[in-house]
Amino acid sequence: MSESSGSALQPGRPSRQPAVHPENLSLDSSCFSSPPVNFLQELPSYRSIARRRTTVHSRDKQSGTLLKPTDSYSSQLEDRIAENLSSHSLRNYALNISEKRRLRDIQETQMKYLSEWDQWKRYSSKSWKRFLEKAREMTTHLELWREDIRSIEGKFGTGIQSYFSFLRFLVLLNLVIFLIIFMLVLLPVLLTKYKITNSSFVLIPFKDMDKQCTVYPVSSSGLIYFYSYIIDLLSGTGFLEETSLFYGHYTIDGVKFQNFTYDLPLAYLLSTIASLALSLLWIVKRSVEGFKINLIRSEEHFQSYCNKIFAGWDFCITNRSMADLKHSSLRYELRADLEEERMRQKIAERTSEETIRIYSLRLFLNCIVLAVLGACFYAIYVATVFSQEHMKKEIDKMVFGENLFILYLPSIVITLANFITPMIFAKIIRYEDYSPGFEIRLTILRCVFMRLATICVLVFTLGSKITSCDDDTCDLCGYNQKLYPCWETQVGQEMYKLMIFDFIIILAVTLFVDFPRKLLVTYCSSCKLIQCWGQQEFAIPDNVLGIVYGQTICWIGAFFSPLLPAIATLKFIIIFYVKEWSLLYTCRPSPRPFRASNSNFFFLLVLLIGLCLAIIPLTISISRIPSSKACGPFTNFNTTWEVIPKTVSTFPSSLQSFIHGVTSEAFAVPFFMIICLIMFYFIALAGAHKRVVIQLREQLSLESRDKCYLIQKLTEAQRDMRN
């Protein structure tokens, strides 16, 4: 195209030149090489760059952002890609097949001019990457419940699939925790107990202490009724109390092998610390991945509407009814977005009197919420105190049902509180005048706090009973030895009962509530009351809160009951199949799906809250409450944590000095300041990246406006040529 044709594209200048093709307009740089042409200065992107010229100096003033000469750029891109082919696969590049073939030919041509050593390195690198890809593909086929989860995703979409993927993650997490405890604690004991290795137990040398603190009463071995075994199995007492399931079984100081002595108290404590640290790192890693996805998906409201309308369909759905459900869920999400938009507009238009009235009502309703929580916590406290006092005094005088009720009274009260309070919160929040999305988040937050705080209330109630007594026993032993001769085992029994009772409730609700409800809705369709009752919905947030509750129990109880992670693994495996059967045959997906269910970020965030709440009572138990003197591996230590300073004292003096220096305040304060500076740096870096992302989004918008502008000018030029 000549210079005159370039000027013909200016507004109001007719032209007799041939028609201009878009590919020539975008690729041929000669058409914009003449200095008098000022057409490109009219592009929206060029005007934006002119306004930001102080920050963008590398832009070409004549060619804007789109219309640069592309021949040299393409050749440089090809050379760069060809050079990097040795470290990246061709499939990673966004190129068509012909370009990939051309680049492959370039690579083969370059290989001929390399030395034999470089050729061997290239081929070995390719072979190793190909092997890793094949191994990665094979591991995906070995993934637990892969076909089941894919089937659920195909029938019910990605929302419900995320719950089952989260459940699979908890199964794997508990399995790894159990393997850590098994390798560090159980395996040395089993090898010695069954004479598998040439080793022996090192008994704990009892120090000079009051004999009253070392008394551990053994249950009577007289006539035992059959139902006593059922009670023992459900409560962890009796024959289970003396097994390796609980803390009191490990009353040894170590295991002596041929060449060394295995320090069991240290291994017992380190297994708990390692389990919690692994859980924290694993959850944070997966949370960061989900947070990255949420950052990528963060968008403006207009973009959110466009994405839901043009890209909101889930192509994994193959079932007709699920497709209808997806239609309704998209419709609900659009309604929710519009409702939130109306709510924002309503908030902006509120008068000062309405604002005062709304906030006063919210304050009053939040006081009611706090009163409900306080009543639940007090009920758990009273039930725990009543159960602990009567369990030791009158347990032999009770019949089977009364005995079981006393043992499970705290678990029953906690389950009732977890069942009733969500319904109360759902009724209260309707009057607080929040947006629909915030209503869901606030309700879930209250339910999370309720479920997890009940466990903490139970543990702290037990702790208060353990450390308080009426006589001088607490002065002698440091704890209530008369009521709790081995208090760690009894705390483990409470966690065991919570785990078993939660599992029984899940099975009972599925088999005796959901299944009969499905039968009534199916075969009694003429009854209007039953049809109004309807089929049970598969509520994702409620199910997630249930398994997070069970996992929090497992974290707290793993120190007091080392086999509890194995029980939790079996429990979650059974729950997976029960929930899958319930989803397929008794439940229907909720027509109002939780929006964060498309990613596991929210689930992992709730799980992280549960882990933090579990660490608090464990830290207090390990560092503050005196260890039992009648059972367990820490009978010669005032607290469990004292095994760490004792072990450090056996190290060489130089290593001791280093450890004491690292753990001192002189090191901790500067280290904390450096960490804060690094954190501030990354926060500033994230802010800069965010600003760059905003600029790039603006630039993308300007690129599209450039295209529209060019098409408009091209159309005008073609119209002028026809005229």
UniProtKB/Swiss-Prot annotation:
Start and end residues of each stretch annotated as Disordered: 1-28, 51-71
Q: Which GO terms describe its cellular component?
A: neuronal cell body; plasma membrane
Please give the residue ranges for the topological domain Extracellular.
Answer: 1-168, 241-263, 384-404, 516-555, 623-665
Which residues carry attached sugars according to the database record? N24, N84, N96, N259, N638
List residues in topological domain: Cytoplasmic. 190-219, 285-362, 426-494, 577-601, 687-723
Which residues constitute the signal peptide according to the record? none
- Topological relation to the membrane, as annotated: Multi-pass membrane protein
Q: Which cysteine pairs are joined by S-S bonds?
A: none
* Compartment(s): Membrane
What is the role of this chain? Acts as an inhibitory modulator of PIEZO2 mechanosensitive channel in dorsal root ganglion (DRG) neurons through physical interactions or interference with the interaction between PIEZO2 and the cytoskeleton.
The record's similarity note reads:
Belongs to the TMC family.
Its quaternary structure?
Interacts with PIEZO2; the interaction inhibits PIEZO2-conducted mechanically activated currents.
- Specify the protein name: Transmembrane channel-like protein 7
- What organism is listed for this UniProt entry? Homo sapiens
